[in-house]
From Swiss-Prot:
The keyword Cytoplasm applies. Keywords: Chaperone, Cytoplasm, Nickel, Nickel insertion. Pfam families: UreE_C (PF05194), UreE_N (PF02814). GO terms for cellular component: cytoplasm. The keyword Chaperone applies. It comes from the Bacteria. Involved in urease metallocenter assembly. Binds nickel. Probably functions as a nickel donor during metallocenter assembly. It comes from Klebsiella pneumoniae subsp. pneumoniae (strain ATCC 700721 / MGH 78578). Disulfide bonds: none annotated. This is Urease accessory protein UreE. GO terms for molecular function: nickel cation binding; unfolded protein binding.
Length: 158
């Protein structure tokens, strides 16, 4: 079996590809099937979030596998009003929802309860099968993400 052990900082030309949803792209140790049908094992550093376009390599540097972000069931919010998008981000962030933020658009894993909440704010929410690339903080390990150290002047409960 092919073992992919590193993400290349400077991507090389891919010799293969693998299409993965976000819940697999956050795992450091997992068995995957490449798009050409071969089995491969991911043996990556913990806390590494794979993004579409990343290139992984084996230890020998003889195989280069490009990561493709799989289409997933996502709720899509499109809005030209930055205030309304900020309001949506605030409420979704308060619920620790993994969120992809782009100019004029938000995506999160489809959830009809969250969809209804945002519709109550007057936002239009649609469903799509699209790649999902959430902000890293939602998935990063403690050394890479949002810390919850509390200081005398700042506190919040979870």
């Amino acid at each position: 079996m092919l073992y992919l052990t590193q993400r290349l900082e400077i991507p090389s030309a891919a010799t293969a590809s693998v299409t993965l949803p976000i819940d697999v792209r956050v795992k450091s140790r997992v068995k995957v099937t490449l798009n050409d049908g071969r089995e491969a094992g991911l043996l990556l550093p913990r806390g590494l979030l794979l993004r579409g376009g990343d290139v992984l390599s084996n230890e020998e540097g003889t195989e280069f596998v490009q990561v493709i972000a799989a289409d997933e069931g996502v709720s899509v919010v499109r809005c030209d009003d930055p205030f309304m998008l900020a309001k949506a981000c605030y409420h979704l962030g308060n619920r620790h929802v993994p969120l992809q933020i782009m100019p004029g658009e938000l995506r999160y894993h489809h959830d009809h309860v969250l969809d209804d909440m945002l519709r109550q704010f007057g936002l239009t929410v649609t469903f799509g099968q699209l790649p999902f690339e959430p902000e890293a903080g939602a998935y990063a390990s403690e050394s890479h993400g949002h810390h919850h150290a509390h200081h005398d002047h700042h506190a919040h409960s979870h």
